Amino acid sequence: MNFTRIDLNTWNRREHFALYRQQIKCGFSLTTKLDITAFRTALAETDYKFYPVMIYLISRVVNQFPEFRMAMKDNALIYWDQTDPVFTVFHKETETFSALFCRYCPDISEFMAGYNAVMAEYQHNTALFPQGALPENHLNISSLPWVSFDGFNLNITGNDDYFAPVFTMAKFQQEDNRVLLPVSVQVHHAVCDGFHAARFINTLQMMCDNILK
């Protein structure tokens, strides 16, 4: 996969990157609730399922913003031209999950075809990584449909240069006449700030509101 190398001598976040990568090593998570009322109504008019469409939308937003596509490669900071989703699939019989991946395509019908092909081949394979090693250029998506939450955090240790974002969805919440979806965004502070996380959420909400428009 192609990528662009970032020149740390001229990058406007070089001081922030150095601080949060070398001195105050940290990431952060932001949890919010998406209003998916209109989204679910629009989705009901299609043959698409909720989870893969959310995988598509999250991937689409990630591929708009380079701060969510950053990685260390050959001791250099880069951002991928494109990142592909790694998503979890739960196995009821073993109470375990697998991590599958498919190629991101801007066209939703092409994306769904790729997703469905992966699911047809691997959804019943209970290995953690049925397809083998994950692609370098990946983002992470998972779902906890059994419980709702107001906050969610992963404690990632031992890999200070793991910059791939992690997105976690929860069980729907009903609030008056609205349906809300809790979503957690977890990022490395060396490459992503609160502004970027908020922009991601706001863009994702807009995409949910206009999924078929």
Curated annotation (Swiss-Prot):
The family this protein is said to belong to: Belongs to the chloramphenicol acetyltransferase family.
EC number: 2.3.1.28
PANTHER family noted in UniProt: CHLORAMPHENICOL ACETYLTRANSFERASE, SLR0299 PROTEIN
Stated role: This enzyme is an effector of chloramphenicol resistance in bacteria.
Name the UniProt record assigns to this protein: Chloramphenicol acetyltransferase 2
Annotated organism of origin: Haemophilus influenzae
PROSITE patterns, A to Z: CAT
Keywords attached to this entry: Acyltransferase, Antibiotic resistance, Plasmid, Transferase
Miscellaneous: Type II chloramphenicol acetyltransferases are sensitive to inhibition by thiol-reactive reagents. The inactivation occurs as a result of chemical modification of Cys-26.
GO biological process, one term: response to antibiotic
Active site: H189
Gene (UniProt): cat-IIH
Quaternary structure and partners: Homotrimer.
Catalytic activity reported: chloramphenicol + acetyl-CoA = chloramphenicol 3-acetate + CoA
One MF annotation (Gene Ontology) recorded for this entry: chloramphenicol O-acetyltransferase activity
InterPro entries noted in UniProt: CAT-like_dom_sf (IPR023213), Chloramphenicol_AcTrfase_AS (IPR018372), Cmp_AcTrfase (IPR001707)
